[in-house]
Amino acid sequence: MSVLKKNRRKDSDTPQEPSEKAKEQQAEAELRKLRQQFRKMVESRKSFKFRNQQKIASQYKEIKTLKTEQDEITLLLSLMKSSRNMNRSEKNYMELRLLLQTKEDYEALIKSLKVLLAELDEKILQMEKKIANQKQIFAKMQEANNPRKLQKQIHILETRLNLVTVHFDKMLTTNAKLRKEIEDLRFEKAAYDNVYQQLQHCLLMEKKTMNLAIEQSSQAYEQRVEAMARMAAMKDRQKKDTSQYNLEIRELERLYAHESKLKSFLLVKLNDRNEFEEQAKREEALKAKKHVKKNRGESFESYEVAHLRLLKLAESGNLNQLIEDFLAKEEKNFARFTYVTELNNDMEMMHKRTQRIQDEIILLRSQQKLSHDDNHSVLRQLEDKLRKTTEEADMYESKYGEVSKTLDLLKNSVEKLFKKINCDATKILVQLGETGKVTDINLPQYFAIIEKKTNDLLLLETYRRILEVEGAEAEIPPPFINPFWGGSALLKPPEPIKVIPPVLGADPFSDRLDDVEQPLDHSSLRQLVLDNYILKENRSKEVRGDSLPEKVDDFRSRKKVTM
């Protein structure tokens, strides 16, 4: 509404009022905005109301739980303050004092017995040391009194020393050879490193030259294209010049043939005319000089005809200019011919260089292919390694699943035992985030409560037995029975501990060496050591096999007790 009032004030302030349609449109737009705001406010109100209802319900639940806890606490306080419970607690207090007194007496007795046992153990150790010393002294005396055995032992030790020295000398010689080989290999490595550096430098230089050759080949190709275009233009021009030259030669030949025919005709006519006039005078002279005159006339006439033709060819009538033009054309043609031959030679050289570069490119491609193959082999090895690691990870995950299953079973058994012996879990449930189930975090706390409960039960059982003994005044004390649901009958009675004294006899290995009369080599000594090692392994396996059934029986008895 305030927005409408403001709009009305603005409309009243404007000097020119808008039309009714514009006013209706503005009013409808304002109405839409107000409806949207109203819807948003209704939705926000609903959400706020829903959250408040949830908070109130949760607070009601907390109030109920607190009331129930208050009722339980008041009930416990009333029970604790009752006279019956007070008397019982006093009675339990007296019983516990008595039990603690007996416990202290027994602990003092146990300490004294432990001290006595420690003294006896020390005496036993001293006696064993004395017996061992006496046996060693006796054995040494026997060996000292047996010179044959001593001689044999000395001979065996000398042979061993000889073999060891020979082996040591061999090792020294091989060590010296290996040192020499290592030094040689070091020198070779230095030489190979130098060669490698040189080859690396050469490779870099070859790469640079290859790049330059590629650039030059590209430039040469461009120049070749230009030269080919020039050659094509020159060939076209040459064809045109040759065609023009052929036409001119044909025209000159035609003119020469016509003039020669005309000259022959005139000569014939002239001869016929003068034949009658000078027949008598020059008959002999003509006969003698006929051939010479004829040749001279023909050469002169041919010169005249050639001179006339050259004059016709010359545009300005200057023969020197015609000769200079002809010589210039010949020089240009000769220069063009030499340029074309040089271009052909350059093209052949560039073709050879491109062929050599193509061979080098093929070689580099083959090397690149080999490097790609090596990379593929390395990738295959890495894939195999990844596959093995994934298999190991899957195996460890399966083991983790099995261990988690066994841990869940143990948690369930602990929870059952906790409920079965009626242990109090209020200390654990008070903590934050506890739901009353056994987890990895609160498992030690459950174990501590179970241990405390078992100690209390054992104290009660011992107090009950003391009362029974005092009441019955029996001479033979009754056997100890576990209070946990009669499970002690299933336990195996403890067997007496067998103390096996150490055998102080001679070593079988030394006995075998004593039995051997001849000196031993390396292979026979190795065989004796292997036989001795196999005997020791068999004895340890037998001892383990004897102790394994006892461990199995102990594990079964413990399992029955826990069940």
Swiss-Prot record:
**Which top-level group of life is the source organism from?**
Eukaryota
Residue ranges of the region described as Disordered: 1-29
Pfam families in alphabetical order = ODAD1_CC (PF21773)
Return the GO cellular component terms, semicolon-separated. axoneme
Report which residue ranges the record marks as coiled coil.
18-201, 233-291, 341-422
- InterPro entries reported in the protein's UniProt record: ODA-DC/CCD (IPR051876), ODAD1_CC (IPR049258)
Could you tell me the keywords of this UniProt record? Coiled coil, Differentiation, Spermatogenesis
Biological process GO annotation list? cilium movement; outer dynein arm assembly; spermatid development
Biased region (Basic and acidic residues) positions are 10-29
The cross-references to PANTHER family, in alphabetical order and at most eight, read: COILED-COIL DOMAIN-CONTAINING PROTEIN 63 (PTHR21694:SF18)
Explain the purpose of this protein. Plays a role in spermiogenesis. Involved in the elongation of flagella and the formation of sperm heads.
Protein name as annotated: Coiled-coil domain-containing protein 63
Q: Which organism is it from?
A: Homo sapiens (Human)
